[in-house]
C-alpha cells in the first residue's frame, strides 16, 4: 500500500474517532473499498480516488454548522503535511468539494475520480446499511421516524 494512503487511513481513523455512526470510519472504509474496486476498471488516478474517498467525510458540514470549507481546510493542511504535490492536492480537494448529494443539480465538469468516489458513497447509502445510516442520522438529529400530522411532499 502506498505510504500516502497509509498515512491518510491513520489520520482519518483518528479524526473520526467518536463520530456519528453513519459518518464514521466504518462508512469511510466501505466507501474507500468500493471506490478502489470501481477504480480498477476505470482509466483514473488510483491514488486520487483512494485518498479522496478516505477524506470525503472528514468534516461533514451536517455536523459542523453547515461549514462547507472545514473539510477542505482540514484535508489541505493534512495533505500538505504529508508532502503531496500541489496539483494532486487540488484534484483531491475538487472531489471532496463536489461529492455531496445536494450538488447534484449543478452544472459541473466531473472528473473520473469524482464520479468514482460519488458512486462509491452513493452505493453505501443503499441497502440495509444505507437504511440503518439514515435512521441513525435521523435519531442523531432527534427527527421523528413518522408523524401522521405531516403530509407527504408530492412533487
Where are these regions (language model features)?
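Divalent metal-dependent phosphate-bond-processing catalytic cores, especially two-metal-ion Mg2+/Mn2+ enzymes
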Residues: 2, 16-42, 55, 104-155
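Generic alpha-helical secondary structure signal
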Residues: 3, 7, 30, 91-94
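Generic N-terminal amphipathic, Lys/Arg-enriched alpha-helix
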Residues: 7-18
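An active-site-proximal "capping" alpha-helix that borders the catalytic cofactor pocket
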Residues: 31, 67-81
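His-Asp-centered metal-binding catalytic motifs of divalent-metal-dependent phosphohydrolases/nucleases
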Residues: 46-64, 71, 92-102
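Conserved strand-to-helix beginnings and helix N-cap segments that scaffold or border functional pockets
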Residues: 64-68, 128-129
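Hydrophobic, well-structured mid-protein blocks that either form specific transmembrane helices
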Residues: 82-118
Amino acid at each position: 500500500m502506498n505510504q500516502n494512503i497509509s498515512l491518510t487511513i491513520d489520520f482519518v481513523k483518528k479524526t473520526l474517532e467518536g463520530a456519528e455512526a453513519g459518518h464514521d470510519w466504518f462508512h469511510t472504509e466501505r466507501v474507500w473499498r468500493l471506490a478502489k474496486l470501481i477504480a480498477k476498471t476505470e482509466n483514473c488516478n488510483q491514488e486520487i480516488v483512494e485518498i479522496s474517498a478516505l477524506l470525503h467525510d472528514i468534516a461533514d458540514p451536517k455536523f459542523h454548522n453547515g461549514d462547507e470549507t472545514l473539510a477542505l481546510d482540514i484535508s489541505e493542511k493534512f495533505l500538505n503535511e504529508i508532502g503531496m504535490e500541489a496539483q494532486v492536492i487540488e484534484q483531491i480537494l475538487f472531489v471532496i468539494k463536489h461529492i455531496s448529494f445536494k450538488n447534484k443539480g449543478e452544472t459541473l465538469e466531473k472528473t473520473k475520480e469524482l464520479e468514482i468516489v460519488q458512486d462509491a458513497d452513493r452505493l453505501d447509502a443503499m441497502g440495509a446499511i444505507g437504511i440503518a445510516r439514515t435512521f441513525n442520522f435521523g435519531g442523531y438529529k432527534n427527527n421523528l421516524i413518522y408523524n401522521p400530522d405531516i403530509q407527504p411532499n408530492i412533487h
